[in-house]
Regions:
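Active-site-adjacent "gating/activation" loops or surface patches in catalytic cores
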Residues: 125-142, 244-330, 335-339
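Glycine- and acidic
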Residues: 90-91, 146-156, 194-202, 244-255, ...
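Post-HExxH zinc-binding segment in Zn-dependent metallohydrolases
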Residues: 210-211, 342, 352-382, 388-390, ...
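A glycine-rich phosphate-binding loop feature that marks nucleotide/adenosyl-phosphate handling sites
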Residues: 223-247, 283-293, 354, 386-390, ...
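Catalytic Zn2+-binding segment of zinc metalloproteases
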Residues: 334-348, 368
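C-terminal, non-catalytic "cap/extension" segments appended to globular domains
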Residues: 29, 83-85, 293, 329, ...
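Short, glycine/acidic-rich hinge or "gate" loops at secondary-structure transitions
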Residues: 177-186, 220-238, 279-285, 345-351, ...
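A well-structured
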Residues: 1-252, 265
């Protein structure tokens, strides 16, 4: 078994190098989607390097798990061997070129989204920058901003629909090649969802519909009544986050003027929580692995990418000075803390924590920092921010159910038409959303799923946010009673990495 342990260590080191190379190329591509050099370098890695690595990894996995001494390995290797066996079960050589084509299509969708800007109020803005106008107390400004964004999105709707059609077809072939009836079944194995089933997800949807949807609709009903809107329009509230104009006519929350101010105040915030978190955040800043501003040509969204060889987290986001941006940065910092807490673990397989628990690290950090938001606001605005964030949890869970339910249908019916897709999407929106008047923009509602990048780039990665939100709320409840215990529980859990199962 000592020989096998040595091979596992060597393979881990090789994986670290390869993972970091791919990470750096992906980061460069998303930071500047207009760079042909960045895009071609990333795709060259995907098309020419990663396929060879996949075959090598499969060959090595088979030799390891079939070795007569594998049963004598120490318990620390149990979960790694389980993952190897799972990878062997679903690996098919004929899926490698399909995976390459999938990445090429996803990259094209990111390039399309990164190039989107709109002319509004005499200036050119990125779509993240336009979000500030959707918080305006002037309904006509909100309407104009929303329509400007929608009209721009509709210019690329056809190509994005084509890309998604191709992705669904590719993914169904991948599943069939691997011996699965649907891509849903395949992904439950590929994502190592050993601890819950499709049926559990559907039951979770039902629970969200029963508990959260009525609360969300009540909040929106109050919005319509208080603001005397007559009816709720899509520019009156963000259905994913609950963000909209203030019910009492107060100016929108603006926690920072620029990224430097946000970073400086977050350093103080984390130091106020604990020296440990403060020092970890300062380390992130010192390492200069942050790209936080929004700009033309930058991919949408936010992420944390851990550089496995350097053991350094990289944070990417599109900050435009909004409360939502502050929450995003805290969210990604939570991921980075998780990565740093795991960095003491020797093997890459030990550091690769379950996705569901990865999101506990980030979502609980959002909740646990709330008491410190006075660093960015006076007392009244800090309360507004906290209330808005907690209401956002109520809005987010139905949105998670929406996206997850949509994906379950998509991949159970891979030969669906676009008309069927629009019809099912709208019925799911009706089930988990609020009554909303779309007027002549119902054509955009049909394809509004395109705004959720996960559907293109990371299929089935979404219900994890809901599972993690429950874990985050539990940790927040602990914090309300005992701040130090919550921080200790947080750090102890994060240090485990992938050495324990999700329930453990």
């Amino acid at each position: 078994s000592k020989c096998i342990e040595g091979i596992i260590r060597d393979a881990s080191e090789l994986s670290e190098h390869n993972s970091e190379k791919g990470a750096l190329l992906y980061i460069a591509m998303t930071c500047d989607t207009e760079s042909e050099e960045n895009r071609s370098s990333f795709l060259d890695f995907v098309e020419n390097i990663r396929p060879k690595l996949s075959e090598f990894s499969d060959s090595l996995n088979r030799r390891l798990v079939e070795h007569e001494a594998v049963g004598n390995l120490p318990a620390r290797y149990d979960l790694m061997i389980r993952s190897m066996k799972n990878d062997i079960d679903i690996f098919r050589k004929e899926n490698i070129p399909l995976g390459v084509e999938q990445t090429r299509l996803v990259t094209e969708s990111q390039t399309i989204n990164g190039a989107m800007t709109v002319e509004f109020d005499g200036n050119e803005y990125t779509l993240p920058e336009m979000r500030r106008y959707l918080e305006s107390n002037d309904r006509s400004i909100r309407e104009g901003a929303w329509k400007a964004v929608v009209n721009r999105r509709m210019q690329d709707e056809e190509r994005l629909s084509e890309i998604f059609d191709e992705l669904v077809s590719l993914r169904h072939k991948i599943a069939k090649n691997a011996g699965f009836e649907t891509y849903t079944d395949y992904m439950f194995r590929a994502m190592e969802r050993f601890d819950y089933s499709k049926e559990d997800c559907l039951e979770f949807h039902d629970a969200i519909e029963a508990v959260c949807v009525p609360l969300m609709r009540e909040i929106n009903s109050e919005r319509v009544g208080t603001l005397e809107l007559g009816s709720l329009k899509p520019w009156d509230v963000n259905e994913k986050t609950g963000v909209g104009p203030d019910l009492h006519g107060r100016a929108p929350l603006r926690p920072f003027e620029n990224v430097d101010e946000m970073v400086e105040k977050l350093s103080t915030l984390f130091h106020n929580m604990s020296n440990d978190l403060g020092e970890k955040f300062d380390k992130l800043v010192e390492m200069d692995t942050l790209d936080l501003d929004t700009r033309k040509g930058k991919a949408p969204g936010g992420y944390q990418y851990y550089l496995q060889k350097s053991r350094v987290p990289f944070i990417f986001m599109n900050a435009a000075g909004l409360q939502g941006d502050l929450e995003t940065m805290i969210h990604e910092a939570g991921h980075a803390f998780h990565s740093i807490y795991c960095s003491h673990l020797e093997l890459i397989g030990e550091r690769g924590y379950p996705i569901e628990f990865a999101e506990v690290a980030s979502m609980s950090m959002e909740l646990m920092t709330q008491d410190q938001w006075g660093e960015f606001y006076d007392a009244d605005d800090a309360d507004r921010a906290r209330i808005g964030h907690l209401e956002g949890v109520i809005f987010l869970l139905p949105w998670i159910a929406t996206i997850d339910s949509f994906q379950h249908w998509i991949y159970s019916n891979p030969e669906h038409s676009r008309e069927e897709r629009a019809s099912v999407w709208n019925s799911i929106r009706d089930r988990f959303g609020s009554k909303m008047d779309w007027d002549e923009y119902s054509i955009f509602r049909d394809v509004s799923w395109q705004q959720q990048g996960h559907l293109f780039g990371v299929p089935f990665y979404y219900v994890e946010y809901g599972i993690a939100q429950l874990g985050a709320l539990q940790l927040w409840r602990t914090q309300r009673k005992d701040q130090q215990k919550a921080l200790t529980d947080y750090s102890n859990a994060m240090r485990l990495g992938n050495t324990k199962t999700l329930p453990e």
